[in-house]
C-alpha cells in the first residue's frame, strides 16, 4: 500500500527461507522508488531473492549493547566439570538443527569427548529435536547437558564462561546468541546456512561448515 507513496519506507528483512512459501503471494513484484530494502545479512537477502530475485537489497546488520561491559549475576557451570564448554541456544525445531549438533557430538572420538562438555539451551518446539537431545544426554550424562531456559543474566554469564558457541541451523538469518557470544570474544562454529557465516573470518573468530553435514561439523 505504501509503494509509490510520498512516505519514505525502509523495509528491513530478517526472515528465513522457511517463511517465504507462506507469504510470497503477498509480496509485490515491483516496488516504488520510495521503498528501500535492507537485510540483516546475506542469508536473509538470499531468502527474499528466492521469490523476488530482482529486488535490490542492501545490508543492515542489527546492533546489540556491549553486554560484556555490564554487571550480571554469576551462572554456576560447575556441572560441566571445568572442561571446555560448547554451547548452543535456541528453540528446538528442525530449522535450528539441534539434531545435526547431536550427531556431530556422537561422531567425536572418545578421547575428545572426555575433554569437552556440551550444553543445549532452549524450549522444545518440535519433539524430534528434543528427542535427539534427550537421547544424547542419556547416553553421555557426564558431558552433555540440557537446560530449558536461562534468564538474561544467566545467558550473559554463560557467554562469559563458555569456550565456543555452536549454531547448526539449517536456515537462520542472524542467530542472536552467536552475536552475543562474539560480544564476549567467544569464537563460533556455524553452518553456512546462517547469516553469521558471512561475518566469520575462518580460523580467527570462528569456523563455518557446509552441507548441514554432522561429519564436517565434528571436524571443526
Role assignments for model-derived ranges:
Residues 44, 119-142, 154:
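Short, structured helix-loop element that forms part of the nucleotide-activated donor/catalytic region
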Residues 170:
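Aromatic "clamp/platform" in nucleotide-sugar-dependent glycosyltransferases that forms part
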Residues 149, 157-162:
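Short alpha-helical donor nucleotide-sugar binding micro-motif in glycosyltransferases
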Residues 156, 175-183, 197-198:
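Short alpha-helical segment that forms part of, or immediately flanks, the ligand-binding pocket
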Residues 78-96, 102-105, 119:
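Conserved donor-binding/catalytic core segment of Leloir-type glycosyltransferases
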Residues 202-203, 207-213:
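Conserved acidic donor-binding segment of nucleotide-sugar-dependent glycosyltransferases
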Residues 187-190:
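Short hydrophobic beta-strand element within catalytic cores of glycosyltransferases
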Residues 21, 33-59, 64-68:
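A short, active-site helix/loop in glycosyltransferases that binds the activated sugar's phosphate group
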